[in-house]
Amino acid sequence: MANFNPDILKSSLGVAGVDLWFHANGIDESNVHKPYKPKSKALGNSQVLPRDYTKQRDIEIIMREMAEQVAIRLRRAHKKTMCVSISLGFSKSENRRSLQAQMTVEPTNNTDTLINHVLELFHKKYTSGAVRSVAVNYSKFVDESFGFISLFDDVEQIEKEERLQSAIDNIRNEFGFTSLLRANALEEASRSRARSKLIGGHSAGGLDGLR
């Protein structure tokens, strides 16, 4: 099934054929065009990579993309997270157990902040090895209105970042996730554009508004 032409499966079995092809290839892609309503106490995204990723910079690109994807879902749910976790699965040739790590954070749904948390966990745990699967999860939610402001915080800068994030979300909601991409989306290791072109109406898990 994994080696079948997905277009033939689609023409023969419809959407069910495409779903079978995705599952056979270890890909879990959910259509999230509709506003997300969380049913669980965690939001996450995982993907099986199309090849082994051995360079740290390439893995970082994937981690950044997934951190952003789940951050979008978090804002759609009008929540902030207080716990960030990651998981890295290695290639069969590595004969190694997967790596897991998590950390407690100040309540946030800011993309850049969450990317930094995810990369911090990655740098603490990963030393070497061919990575074949990646997962990013956020949990322990509070309402998006909840937050801490200290005397040392630049309130004006925080509000500026929130307005910018809101503007980016609005553009993507209107024109699709790929209407605004980071520069590293042009690199070979990136998966954002490739996943946006998946057939059968599937969109990259966590990419609200992806077209």
Tell where the protein language model's regions lie, with residue ranges.
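Acidic, metal-coordinating catalytic segment for phosphate/diphosphate chemistry
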Residues: 100, 105-211
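DNA-contacting surface of Y-family translesion DNA polymerases
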Residues: 2-128
